Amino acid sequence: MKVLHLDSGIFLEQSVSRQVSQNIVNKLKEKQDITLFHRDLVANPVPHLAADELLAEEKPLIDELVQELLDADTLVIGAPMYNFTIPTQLKAWFDRVLQAGVTFKYTEQGPQGLVNGKKVYIASGRGGIYSQGEAQAMDHQESYLKQVLAFIGITDVTIIRAEGMNMGDEPRQQGFKEAEQEIETI
Protein backbone atom coordinates (compact mmCIF):
# COMPACT_ATOMS: atom_id res chain seq x y z
CA MET A 1 0.00 0.00 0.00
CA LYS A 2 1.28 3.46 -0.91
CA VAL A 3 0.79 6.12 1.76
CA LEU A 4 1.13 9.87 1.26
CA HIS A 5 1.74 11.52 4.65
CA LEU A 6 1.25 15.30 4.73
CA ASP A 7 2.24 17.36 7.76
CA SER A 8 1.25 21.01 8.16
CA GLY A 9 1.72 21.73 11.87
CA ILE A 10 4.06 24.70 12.28
CA PHE A 11 5.21 23.74 15.78
CA LEU A 12 7.23 20.77 14.48
CA GLU A 13 8.12 18.42 17.39
CA GLN A 14 5.54 20.06 19.67
CA SER A 15 2.77 19.76 17.07
CA VAL A 16 -0.15 17.63 18.21
CA SER A 17 -1.28 16.91 14.65
CA ARG A 18 2.24 15.73 13.75
CA GLN A 19 2.32 13.38 16.73
CA VAL A 20 -1.11 11.97 15.95
CA SER A 21 -0.44 11.66 12.21
CA GLN A 22 2.84 9.82 12.93
CA ASN A 23 0.97 7.46 15.25
CA ILE A 24 -1.51 6.77 12.44
CA VAL A 25 1.36 5.99 10.06
CA ASN A 26 2.94 3.72 12.68
CA LYS A 27 -0.35 1.83 13.06
CA LEU A 28 -0.63 1.40 9.28
CA LYS A 29 2.94 0.03 9.25
CA GLU A 30 2.00 -2.50 11.95
CA LYS A 31 -0.92 -3.79 9.91
CA GLN A 32 0.76 -4.15 6.50
CA ASP A 33 3.74 -3.30 4.36
CA ILE A 34 3.56 0.26 3.16
CA THR A 35 5.53 2.47 0.84
CA LEU A 36 5.61 5.84 2.56
CA PHE A 37 6.09 9.26 1.03
CA HIS A 38 6.22 12.07 3.60
CA ARG A 39 5.73 15.67 2.51
CA ASP A 40 6.36 18.25 5.21
CA LEU A 41 4.48 21.34 4.07
CA VAL A 42 6.22 23.50 6.68
CA ALA A 43 9.82 22.43 6.07
CA ASN A 44 9.22 22.43 2.29
CA PRO A 45 6.29 24.76 1.71
CA VAL A 46 4.26 24.82 -1.46
CA PRO A 47 4.13 28.44 -2.66
CA HIS A 48 0.84 30.21 -2.15
CA LEU A 49 -1.09 31.09 -5.28
CA ALA A 50 -0.06 34.26 -7.06
CA ALA A 51 -0.69 35.36 -10.64
CA ASP A 52 3.00 35.12 -11.59
CA GLU A 53 3.18 31.55 -10.30
CA LEU A 54 0.39 30.35 -12.55
CA LEU A 55 2.77 30.48 -15.47
CA ALA A 56 4.52 27.51 -17.05
CA GLU A 57 7.30 27.35 -14.44
CA GLU A 58 4.76 26.19 -11.84
CA LYS A 59 3.63 23.20 -13.91
CA PRO A 60 6.41 20.81 -12.79
CA LEU A 61 5.56 21.38 -9.12
CA ILE A 62 1.84 20.99 -9.76
CA ASP A 63 2.47 17.79 -11.72
CA GLU A 64 4.66 16.41 -8.92
CA LEU A 65 2.10 17.14 -6.19
CA VAL A 66 -0.80 15.76 -8.22
CA GLN A 67 1.15 12.60 -9.08
CA GLU A 68 1.95 12.00 -5.40
CA LEU A 69 -1.77 12.25 -4.67
CA LEU A 70 -2.79 10.00 -7.54
CA ASP A 71 -0.14 7.38 -6.70
CA ALA A 72 -1.23 7.06 -3.07
CA ASP A 73 -3.72 4.46 -1.90
CA THR A 74 -4.03 6.16 1.48
CA LEU A 75 -3.45 9.70 2.68
CA VAL A 76 -2.57 10.66 6.24
CA ILE A 77 -3.03 14.39 6.71
CA GLY A 78 -1.72 16.14 9.81
CA ALA A 79 -4.06 19.13 9.99
CA PRO A 80 -4.07 21.34 13.07
CA MET A 81 -6.79 23.92 13.57
CA TYR A 82 -5.43 27.47 13.38
CA ASN A 83 -7.96 30.25 13.85
CA PHE A 84 -10.84 27.84 13.16
CA THR A 85 -9.46 26.50 9.87
CA ILE A 86 -6.48 24.71 8.32
CA PRO A 87 -2.93 26.09 8.07
CA THR A 88 -2.17 28.12 4.97
CA GLN A 89 0.55 25.60 4.10
CA LEU A 90 -2.06 22.87 3.70
CA LYS A 91 -4.40 25.20 1.82
CA ALA A 92 -1.56 25.95 -0.63
CA TRP A 93 -1.19 22.20 -1.25
CA PHE A 94 -4.91 21.86 -1.99
CA ASP A 95 -4.72 24.90 -4.28
CA ARG A 96 -2.15 23.03 -6.35
CA VAL A 97 -3.76 19.57 -6.46
CA LEU A 98 -7.27 20.75 -7.33
CA GLN A 99 -6.72 20.68 -11.08
CA ALA A 100 -9.64 20.74 -13.50
CA GLY A 101 -9.42 17.82 -15.89
CA VAL A 102 -7.02 15.93 -13.62
CA THR A 103 -8.42 15.65 -10.08
CA PHE A 104 -11.94 16.83 -10.95
CA LYS A 105 -13.92 17.78 -14.03
CA TYR A 106 -16.89 19.95 -14.78
CA THR A 107 -19.98 18.23 -16.17
CA GLU A 108 -23.48 19.38 -17.04
CA GLN A 109 -24.51 18.20 -13.57
CA GLY A 110 -21.68 20.11 -11.87
CA PRO A 111 -18.17 19.17 -10.74
CA GLN A 112 -17.22 15.51 -10.53
CA GLY A 113 -14.24 14.18 -8.56
CA LEU A 114 -11.70 12.06 -10.42
CA VAL A 115 -9.63 10.85 -7.44
CA ASN A 116 -11.62 7.83 -6.32
CA GLY A 117 -10.97 4.76 -4.20
CA LYS A 118 -8.63 6.34 -1.67
CA LYS A 119 -8.73 6.27 2.13
CA VAL A 120 -7.88 9.40 4.12
CA TYR A 121 -7.00 9.70 7.79
CA ILE A 122 -6.98 13.24 9.14
CA ALA A 123 -5.04 13.91 12.34
CA SER A 124 -6.87 16.93 13.72
CA GLY A 125 -5.19 18.82 16.54
CA ARG A 126 -7.18 21.52 18.33
CA GLY A 127 -6.49 23.77 21.31
CA GLY A 128 -10.16 23.87 22.29
CA ILE A 129 -13.14 21.58 21.83
CA TYR A 130 -14.95 22.27 18.57
CA SER A 131 -16.64 18.94 17.86
CA GLN A 132 -19.69 19.69 19.98
CA GLY A 133 -21.69 22.48 21.52
CA GLU A 134 -21.77 26.10 20.41
CA ALA A 135 -18.11 26.05 19.34
CA GLN A 136 -18.94 23.52 16.62
CA ALA A 137 -20.24 26.38 14.46
CA MET A 138 -16.70 27.81 14.42
CA ASP A 139 -15.17 24.65 12.91
CA HIS A 140 -14.04 25.51 9.40
CA GLN A 141 -11.21 22.98 9.56
CA GLU A 142 -12.78 19.53 9.41
CA SER A 143 -15.77 20.70 7.37
CA TYR A 144 -13.44 22.26 4.79
CA LEU A 145 -11.25 19.16 4.59
CA LYS A 146 -14.20 16.81 4.10
CA GLN A 147 -15.73 19.06 1.43
CA VAL A 148 -12.54 19.66 -0.56
CA LEU A 149 -11.67 15.95 -0.49
CA ALA A 150 -15.21 15.04 -1.61
CA PHE A 151 -14.90 17.62 -4.40
CA ILE A 152 -12.05 15.57 -5.91
CA GLY A 153 -13.82 12.27 -5.28
CA ILE A 154 -12.45 11.16 -1.90
CA THR A 155 -15.25 10.34 0.52
CA ASP A 156 -13.70 7.62 2.71
CA VAL A 157 -12.40 10.00 5.38
CA THR A 158 -11.70 9.20 9.03
CA ILE A 159 -10.97 12.09 11.36
CA ILE A 160 -8.89 11.30 14.42
CA ARG A 161 -9.24 14.26 16.70
CA ALA A 162 -7.08 15.43 19.61
CA GLU A 163 -9.06 18.25 21.20
CA GLY A 164 -8.65 20.39 24.30
CA MET A 165 -4.88 20.56 23.91
CA ASN A 166 -4.64 24.10 25.36
CA MET A 167 -7.26 23.67 28.09
CA GLY A 168 -5.00 22.29 30.82
CA ASP A 169 -3.25 19.03 31.62
CA GLU A 170 -6.34 16.89 32.20
CA PRO A 171 -8.17 17.83 28.97
CA ARG A 172 -4.88 17.49 27.06
CA GLN A 173 -4.30 13.97 28.39
CA GLN A 174 -7.92 13.06 27.66
CA GLY A 175 -7.61 14.42 24.11
CA PHE A 176 -4.51 12.32 23.43
CA LYS A 177 -6.14 9.26 25.01
CA GLU A 178 -9.21 9.56 22.79
CA ALA A 179 -7.05 10.00 19.69
CA GLU A 180 -5.00 6.91 20.58
CA GLN A 181 -8.17 4.88 21.12
CA GLU A 182 -9.34 5.88 17.63
CA ILE A 183 -5.97 4.94 16.13
CA GLU A 184 -6.23 1.47 17.68
CA THR A 185 -9.37 0.84 15.60
CA ILE A 186 -7.51 1.32 12.30
Swiss-Prot record:
Pfam families: Flavodoxin_2 (PF02525). Its EC number is 1.6.5.-, 1.7.1.17. Binds 1 FMN per subunit. Keywords: Flavoprotein, FMN, NAD, Oxidoreductase. InterPro entries: Flavodoxin_fold, Flavoprotein-like_sf, FMN-dep_NADH:Q_OxRdtase_AzoR1, NADH:quinone_OxRdtase_FMN_depd. It comes from the Bacteria. One of its GO terms (molecular function) is oxidoreductase activity, acting on NAD(P)H as acceptor. It is an enzyme of class 1 (oxidoreductase). Disulfide bonds: none annotated. Its cofactor is FMN. PANTHER family: FMN-DEPENDENT NADH-AZOREDUCTASE 1, FMN-DEPENDENT NADH:QUINONE OXIDOREDUCTASE. Quinone reductase that provides resistance to thiol-specific stress caused by electrophilic quinones. Homodimer. Belongs to the azoreductase type 1 family. This is FMN-dependent NADH:quinone oxidoreductase 1.
